[in-house]
Amino acid sequence: MKLSIGIFFGGLFGALGILIYLVAFGSDYWLLAKEIEKCSENQETGDNATHSVLLHHEGFFWRCWFNHAEEENSNTMENFWFTNQAPTKNCTHAYLSPFPQNRDNSNSTSYHSALVYRGFWNIFMLLGVVTAVIGGFLIICAAPFTNHRIYKAGGGLFITSGILFALVVVMHVFWVQSVSDIKGYTDTRQQDCSQFTVYVSFGWSFMLAPFGIFFCLFAGMLFLLVGHTIHVHTK
């Protein structure tokens, strides 16, 4: 009875972890950015002034951007909801042009360093998703049997995927805080527009990832415990 409960909750947490991984992997909202350029003439002033801003959102596959008119004190996160986005937007492959890097600067050292860092980030995320999915298939195959090795292998894969995705989250934090060189990008743009500002924040794809990590790690520990229990009782 206790073994069945462990298998049930392990399967439940594992399924939730895989689902969250797939959503975070497939959605392009790991990074949100807003560029405001107040250098044009006849610019409105005041707390409720409306400005034309450029919004970016980026994930594993794509980096997209679109123009949006908003008030100075508006909530940036709300502007990225599908219902609030522009009818058309421009997109490019994120691994070739991660924000704020641009392929026009392909000869610069910072661009190549960003691509290398981004490449490792992509690899860790892809490995995390694949490892969790394979672990899920192993557990499904182990369900009709009492083979402790399959349960332990599945549990180990879930824990490995949790560690890989934890590295993805940590690397993304470092990317936003230092590697992407937001300050250098802002300084460069301010040479042409002294009132240029850029705001960068973590998107909901990033915020989902820790929940997937928790579920996969917990599922992995449960399946390791199930495998150990089966092994003890079959001796």
From Swiss-Prot:
InterPro entries: PMP22/EMP/MP20/Claudin (IPR004031), TMEM182 (IPR026763). The keyword Transmembrane applies. The keyword Ribosomal protein does not apply. Residues 144-155, 227-235 are cytoplasmic. It comes from the Eukaryota. Its main location: membrane. It is found in: Cell membrane. It is a multi-pass membrane protein. The chain crosses the membrane at residues 123-143, 156-176, 206-226. GO terms for biological process: muscle organ development; myotube cell development involved in skeletal muscle regeneration; myotube differentiation involved in skeletal muscle regeneration; negative regulation of myoblast differentiation; negative regulation of myoblast fusion. Keywords: Cell membrane, Glycoprotein, Membrane, Myogenesis, Signal, Transmembrane, Transmembrane helix. Pfam families: Claudin_2 (PF13903). Residues 34-122, 177-205 are extracellular. Residues 1-33 form the signal peptide. GO terms for cellular component: plasma membrane. Glycans are attached at residues 48, 90, 107. May negatively regulate myogenesis and skeletal muscle regeneration. Belongs to the TMEM182 family. This is Transmembrane protein 182. It comes from Xenopus tropicalis (Western clawed frog).
